C-alpha cells in the first residue's frame, strides 16, 4: 500500500488530467489520505455548500421487456399509469413545493415516443415552471426504435414537448463485457454514449451514473469514470455524477454473488468510489452526488467528507432501490436533509436540477452543528 499520494498524481489531478493508472493507484492509498485529498478538491470546486433538490420520483410502470439481471423492479404485466394518474402525482409534487419531477419507467413493448411526449406536454401545459427530468437513455432509444425514427429526432421531439433534462441512468458499467452479463438486452456502451451526446447536442443536459459492486473489475470502474470525463470534455452537458452501489437483493445477479459469498459493497469501498470520482473528474464534472437512498443517511453524511457535495432529492417515492433491498426509505423532508448537512459541518442550499440556487436554508438552522454532530 502506498502511504502517500505521489506529487505527480496530485499535480495531474489539479490539472484535470488524471490517468487510468492514477485511478488504480488511488485504490491503494490509505483511505483517509484519499478522502482528505478528495475533500480538498471538493472544497476548491464547491466550497462548504451542500446542495439538494426538492423533487418527486414518478415510476409510471414496472412493466418491461428488458432482461436486466440486476433489476428487482421489472414485471411482465405491471400497471401503466395513465396521463391523469401521472398528473395527479405532479400536482402533489407542486403542492410540496417541488421544482422537479423525475419520471422513468420500464420499457413498454408497444409504446412509442408519442406517450413520452404526451407526458411532457401535459405537465408543461399545467405547470410550465416545473422542471421535467425524465426518460433514461434506454427509454429514449427503445421508444425511438418502436416509433421508427432516429434517436436524434426523438430527442428533438422530446425537447419541443418540454423535456428539460435527462437522467444519465442505464449506464450501469460502461463495459460491454459487463453489460453482456448483467443486461444483455440493454443498449451497448457506444449506444449509451451516442444517446447522451445527442441529448447534449439537442440542448438536453443529463446526469451520469455508475452502478458498481457486481461483476465489474476495479479497472472497469476507473474506465467508466474516465469515459464520463471524456463525454464531458466533448459536450459539457453533464450536470452531476452519481455513483450508485448495487443492491444485491431480490434479483438474479445479486442472488448469484451472494451464493459466492459476496454481498453489498462495504461502506469503505463506497467512500473510496466517491473520493476517486471527485479526483478523476476534477475540473470537468463539478458535482458529485451521494445517494442517501443507496448509501443510507449516515454514510451519505460521511461521503460529504470524501468528495461529494450534493445529497440528491427529497424523492417522495422510490420503488426501484426499495424493491432491490435498499432499507433507507423512499422520502426525506427538507428539514431532515438540512439537519444531515449541518451535521456534516456543511451549509445546505436548495438547488434546481441545473444547480442554480433556489434559496439558502441557513435561516432554518436550529443551532450551528459541528462536524461531530454536536449543537453549540
UniProtKB/Swiss-Prot annotation:
It comes from the Archaea. Keywords: 4Fe-4S, Iron, Iron-sulfur, Metal-binding, S-adenosyl-L-methionine, Transferase. Pfam families: CofH_C, Radical_SAM. Its cofactor is [4Fe-4S] cluster. Residues 50-284 form the Radical SAM core domain. CDD domains: Radical_SAM (cd01335). [4Fe-4S] cluster binds at residues 64, 68, 71. This is 5-amino-6-(D-ribitylamino)uracil--L-tyrosine 4-hydroxyphenyl transferase 1. It comes from Methanosarcina barkeri (strain Fusaro / DSM 804).
Amino acid at each position: 500500500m502506498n502511504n502517500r499520494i505521489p506529487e505527480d498524481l496530485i499535480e495531474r489531478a489539479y490539472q484535470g488530467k488524471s490517468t487510468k493508472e492514477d485511478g488504480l493507484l488511488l485504490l491503494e492509498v490509505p483511505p483517509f489520505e484519499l478522502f482528505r485529498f478528495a475533500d480538498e478538491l471538493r472544497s476548491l470546486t464547491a466550497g462548504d455548500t451542500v446542495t439538494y433538490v426538492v423533487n418527486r420520483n414518478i415510476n409510471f410502470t414496472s412493466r418491461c421487456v428488458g432482461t436486466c439481471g440486476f433489476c428487482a423492479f421489472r414485471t411482465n404485466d405491471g400497471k401503466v399509469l395513465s396521463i391523469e394518474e401521472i398528473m395527479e402525482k405532479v400536482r402533489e409534487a407542486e403542492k410540496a413545493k417541488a421544482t422537479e419531477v423525475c419520471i422513468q419507467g420500464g420499457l413498454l413493448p408497444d409504446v412509442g415516443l408519442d406517450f413520452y411526449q404526451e407526458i411532457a406536454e401535459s405537465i408543461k401545459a399545467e405547470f410550465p415552471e416545473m422542471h421535467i427530468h425524465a426518460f433514461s437513455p434506454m427509454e429514449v432509444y427503445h421508444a425511438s426504435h418502436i416509433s421508427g425514427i432516429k434517436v436524434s429526432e426523438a430527442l428533438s421531439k422530446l425537447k419541443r414537448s418540454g423535456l428539460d433534462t435527462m437522467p444519465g441512468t442505464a449506464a450501469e458499467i460502461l463495459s460491454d463485457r459487463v453489460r453482456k452479463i448483467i443486461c444483455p438486452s440493454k443498449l451497448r456502451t457506444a449506444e449509451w454514449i451516442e444517446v447522451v451526446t445527442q441529448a447534449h447536442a439537442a440542448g438536453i443536459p443529463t446526469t451520469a451514473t455508475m452502478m458498481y459492486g457486481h461483476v465489474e473489475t476495479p479497472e472497469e470502474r476507473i474506465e467508466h469514470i474516465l469515459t464520463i470525463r471524456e463525454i464531458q470534455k466533448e459536450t459539457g452537458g453533464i450536470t452531476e455524477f452519481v455513483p450508485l452501489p448495487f443492491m444485491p437483493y431480490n434479483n438474479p445477479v445479486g442472488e448469484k454473488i451472494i451464493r459466492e459469498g459476496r454481498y453489498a459493497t462495504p461502506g469503505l469501498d463506497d467512500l473510496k468510489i466517491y473520493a476517486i470520482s471527485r479526483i478523476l473528474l476534477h475540473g470537468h464534472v463539478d458535482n458529485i452526488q451521494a445517494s442517501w437512498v443507496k448509501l443510507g443517511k449516515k454514510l451519505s453524511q460521511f461521503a460529504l467528507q470524501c468528495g461529494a457535495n450534493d445529497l440528491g432529492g427529497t424523492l417522495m417515492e422510490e420503488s426501484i432501490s426499495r424493491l432491490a433491498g435498499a432499507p433507507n426509505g423512499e422520502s426525506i423532508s427538507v428539514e431532515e436533509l438540512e439537519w444531515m448537512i449541518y451535521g456534516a459541518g456543511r451549509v445546505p442550499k436548495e438547488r434546481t436540477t441545473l444547480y442554480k440556487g433556489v434559496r439558502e436554508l441557513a435561516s432554518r438552522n436550529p443551532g450551528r452543528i459541528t462536524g461531530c454532530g454536536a449543537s453549540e
